[in-house]
């Protein structure tokens, strides 16, 4: 029942530490790689962890004195203890080879395998501290029930067989990567390949080409960058668009585009599971048009993470599928088909609550056991859910109009030289914060003044597509990428105050 923290980038040793902890019966506390030293100190102390497994790069920035409850700190590079405050623990570390030889004099054999069986499916397995867009981290308590249900769903829906390959590139400290890449892949007998750092789209594409994974799980940003850089430019011209409108040629172009897109991702995959953040509407429409095998999964850490998903063959455009097995999903709206309401859910995937935070738990799980996600969506008659935006992100104007910034950002992000954008409300006026694609702009000989003119042209063009109450009044150039969570969602709370 003791807590063990683990903080490092993806690696085989991360996986070993995780499995050693949960099979021993302790509670694992994965810490996201993006958390800084102060965050790590706070999580270690708040979780009352006894051991911390840490990578050498992270260890250099930590202060052991700031984590007084720890019995020991172990480097994940070679499992060497760098801090040991307990005599029994020190004894075990110093004499581990002798102790191992005494217990297994004829080496470790299959009959020695005896995993601890949890007393109850409700027993706590994981405490996962969120890194949300609101800036407040909470410890999500996931029981074995939730882990089992999520992994079981993957087995029910995905075709991975023993010996298949999976590239683990999502942070293992986040439940999306932990479940889809690691726990599901491991339990299916797949070969796991860990990308030990957050690589560029070029490195990711290279790894797909060499490893040829059977399934791919990733955040939208990765797919969008690869498709926009490698595929869309081939048809994003007058001739390409004209050919796409010709029925006979159209089918050939689609097949060619699908083949090229499949090659970028290794050609061997059954489907790409995209989740963690809103997906660009133009990129999705293109993928659907060419018959590319992608699906959108919707979930949150509090459900470990899966809430909605469907196979790519049945997925409807712009939706995130239906409620998964063992989960119920409702839209809190008088007219769920036409009027967006909050997504609420309950079922086997649900967390136990927030660690040492009963107040926050009661605010998200009601007395009837429904978890209130904070996301707004509609649901059609077949049960397909389409997320419209996040209730906390919704902008309310003085005239009473509800504006969902994600919908405007999705359009703006498809315009020339826009890398990413954020829509904020300033003095009851909509302002677009834009991080331009400087590399592309400079490669085309543009200067700062040219970029500013293009962004103003984009604003005018976009306003022609938007209703009067959604008009963008101003563009503000952002010179650095926006700060993001592990799921590559922009931390909106950091950009509410617009200067200039």
Which stretches of residues belong to each language-model region?
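Short, small-residue-biased leader/transition segments that mark boundaries at the very start
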Residues: 1-6
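Structural core segment of the AMP-binding/adenylate-forming
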Residues: 23-103, 428
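AMP-binding/adenylate-forming catalytic core of the ANL superfamily
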Residues: 35, 52, 347, 352-353, ...
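Conserved pre-ATP/AMP-binding loop-to-beta segment of ANL
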Residues: 93-129, 136, 159-165
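Conserved AMP-binding A3 loop
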Residues: 125-149
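Conserved ATP-binding/catalytic segment of the ANL
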Residues: 130, 330, 337-397
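Conserved AMP-binding/adenylation subdomain of ANL enzymes
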Residues: 148-165, 172-259
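Gly/Ser/Thr-rich phosphate-binding loop
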Residues: 214-217, 227-315, 419
């Amino acid at each position: 029942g003791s807590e063990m923290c683990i903080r490092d980038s993806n690696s085989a040793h991360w996986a070993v530490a995780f499995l050693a902890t949960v099979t021993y019966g302790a509670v694992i506390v994965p810490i996201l790689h993006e958390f800084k030293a102060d965050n790590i100190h706070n999580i270690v102390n708040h979780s009352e962890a006894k051991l911390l497994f840490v990578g050498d790069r992270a260890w250099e920035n930590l202060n052991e004195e700031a984590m007084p409850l720890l019995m020991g700190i172990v480097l994940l590079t070679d499992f060497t203890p760098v801090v040991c405050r307990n005599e029994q623990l020190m004894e075990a570390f110093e004499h581990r080879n002798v102790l191992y030889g005494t217990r297994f004099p004829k080496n470790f054999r299959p009959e020695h395998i005896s995993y601890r069986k949890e007393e109850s499916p409700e027993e706590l397995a994981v405490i996962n501290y969120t890194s949300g867009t609101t800036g407040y981290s909470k410890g999500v308590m996931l029981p074995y029930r939730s882990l089992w249900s999520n992994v079981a769903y993957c087995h029910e829906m995905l075709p991975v067989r023993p010996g298949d390959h999976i590239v683990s590139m999502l942070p293992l400290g986040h439940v999306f990567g932990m479940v889809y890449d690691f726990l599901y892949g491991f339990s299916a007998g797949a070969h796991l390949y860990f990308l030990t750092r957050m690589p560029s789209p070029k490195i990711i594409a290279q790894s797909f080409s060499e490893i040829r994974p059977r399934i791919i799980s990733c955040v939208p940003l990765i797919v969008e960058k690869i498709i926009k850089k490698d595929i869309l430019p081939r048809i994003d011209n007058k001739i390409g668009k004209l050919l796409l409108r010709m029925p006979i040629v159209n089918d050939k172009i689609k097949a060619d585009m699908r083949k090229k897109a499949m090659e970028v991702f290794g050609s061997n995959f059954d489907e790409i599971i995209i989740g963690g953040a809103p997906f660009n509407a133009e990129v999705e429409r293109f993928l659907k048009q060419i018959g590319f095998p992608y699906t959108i999964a919707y979930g949150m850490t509090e459900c470990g993470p899966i809430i909605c998903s469907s196979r790519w063959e049945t997925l409807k455009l712009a939706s995130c599928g239906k409620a998964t097995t063992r989960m119920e999903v409702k839209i809190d709206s008088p007219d769920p088909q036409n009027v967006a309401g909050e997504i609420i859910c309950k079922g086997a995937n649900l967390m136990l609550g927030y660690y040492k935070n009963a107040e926050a738990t009661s605010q998200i799980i009601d007395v009837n056991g429904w978890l209130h996600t904070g996301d707004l969506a509609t649901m059609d008659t077949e049960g397909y859910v389409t997320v419209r935006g996040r209730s906390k992100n919704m902008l309310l104007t003085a005239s009473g109009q509800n504006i969902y910034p994600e919908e405007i950002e999705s359009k703006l992000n498809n315009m020339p030289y826009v890398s990413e954008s954020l829509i904020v409300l300033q003095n009851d006026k909509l302002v677009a914060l834009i991080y331009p694609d400087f590399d592309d702009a400079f490669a085309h000989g543009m200067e700062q003044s040219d970029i500013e003119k293009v962004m103003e042209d984009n604003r005018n063009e976009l306003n022609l597509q938007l209703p009067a109450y959604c008009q963008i009044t101003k563009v503000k150039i952002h010179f650095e990428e926006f700060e993001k969570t592990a799921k590559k969602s922009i931390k909106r709370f950091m950009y509410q105050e617009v200067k200039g």
